[in-house]
Swiss-Prot record:
Gene name linked to the record: LTP2
Matches recorded under PANTHER family: NON-SPECIFIC LIPID-TRANSFER PROTEIN 2-RELATED
Pfam families referenced in this protein's UniProt entry, alphabetically: Tryp_alpha_amyl
Disulfide feature: C27-C73, C37-C50, C51-C96, C71-C110
Endpoints of the signal sequence: 1-23
Protein name: Non-specific lipid-transfer protein 2
One Gene Ontology MF term: lipid binding
Organism: Solanum pennellii
Length: 114
């Protein structure tokens, strides 16, 4: 029985050591996930696959740090794209029937996002 316990502990240790580490969300991921939204937000196309991107981002941003990163990236994008309809950006969560804990706006304080 003692040998079985040692083997079980060894197997568990190996699983912990080789388990993939969770990577933090990056602005590149946020941008690529929401790329289908750009034509819609610039009044150049339909909503299309945008909601799938919004829901995908919501699924990727599981931690407070990830949500703050996503917020910062969205805030930066909202400020840098000329011609972006900020009203559409702010209403995107409700349009796509998702709950994002912050407003997509250049004025959002991302440090307060939980």
């Amino acid at each position: 029985m003692e040998m079985v316990n040692k083997i079980a502990c060894f197997v568990l240790l190996c699983m912990v050591v080789v388990a993939p580490h969770a990577e933090a969300l990056t602005c590149g991921q946020v941008t690529s996930t929401l790329a289908p939204c750009l034509p819609y937000l610039m009044n150049r196309g339909p909503l299309g696959g945008c909601c799938g991107g919004v829901k995908g981002l919501l699924g990727q941003a599981q931690t407070t740090v990830d949500r703050q990163t996503a917020c910062t990236c969205l805030k930066s994008a909202a400020s840098s794209f000329t011609g972006l309809d900020l009203g559409k950006a702010a209403s995107l969560p409700s349009t796509c029937s998702v709950n994002i804990p912050y407003k997509i706006s250049p004025s959002t304080d991302c440090s307060k996002v939980q």
